Amino acid sequence: MTSSADYKNLESKYYMQVVNRMPPVLVRGEGTRVFDNDGNNYLDFTAGWAVLNLGHSHPAVTEAIRDQAGKILQMSNLFYTTPQLPLAKIIVDNSDIDRVFFCNSGAEANEGACKVARKWGKIKLNGAYEIITTLDSFHGRTQAMMAATGQPHYQDNWRPLMPGFVNVPYNNVQAIKDAYTEGKTCAVLLEPVQGEGGVNVPSDNYLKEVMDFCHDKNILFMLDEVQTGMGRLGTLFGYQQFPGVEPDVMTLAKALGSGAPLGAFTTKQFCSVLEPGDHGSTFGGNALTTAAGAAAAKVIVDEGIPRLATETGAYFQGKLMALAEKHSFIEEVRGMGLLIAIQMTQDIAAATVTAALPEGLLINAVRPNMVRFMPPLNVTRDEVDEAVAILDKVFANTSD
């Protein structure tokens, strides 16, 4: 058997050094657990970065991939293939959206949404092109999406940024109104809850007020549901947590493919402005990835998985709040569904992640003073208890 050290040597020799990797060489996953090359197992409270909402190796997903691999993997979108179209129907039937285009990633999905917005501005708003986004957002790592992402540490090495985006404070309706310029602004792009920005949950009326403003100005109200979609916040799509909110354009990825590389941008009929030749993708919506996506979506919808996110998320937050009573440096517990963070008074998030690893828990330092949790939505309460016990042990060794 190739040793973990051998794999790490291969990585250091051949792979671009763009990621600071954690030590385990992971070889297998099942449910909420992953297993490394040395036989250790870990609770995965990252879910492959909010991708594996049904956990690792869910039987319905693995069976769908195995079955589709023996039929057809890939054809040009010039031809009809299945199960691309049934997956599109599941999305439309369970949302306020009318049209779907499949791509390969969240960044691609957001690029597509911005193309919709730009064309809307061209044909409806006399050439308006600017898109308002928010500080602490995250929309991807392409050139355009780095300009859309309102975090300087993602942007600074790539300046000058692509024009056409303006970043304003999140959860501030007036900031969006102030940034709007008639004849220039064509859309607003927001996350229902900011994930990479620190699990920032907006006030109850924020999204609705922004939507109403967009409609008043005839600009598109676009929601990036790459991290929040497919049940993570407690409803199939995150916006459904906020009464009266309906996106004109919505993007998806991560959990959409349940581990297969699949994204989508979706529109209401009135703003479905792309025509043949306006957009395309060689691999987007191929038979293999949409087979995985359709299988996962069916389980999520039919088995009421978003409800588990609500119930287990509330249980998990309660346990974390109890930890905060014991450890005074835990300043705040916040989140929605199973997208949760703890904020601390000290910059010890990285140390917490490092200390939790040998205890058997995978978590994420989303800010220097903040740890993020995004486990599979079918995580059990016993697994939550196990994770909290590990955190308690780690925090007990942290100076208040």
Language-model regions, residue ranges each:
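Conserved N-terminal phosphate-binding loop of PLP-dependent enzymes in the Aspartate aminotransferase
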Residues: 1-400
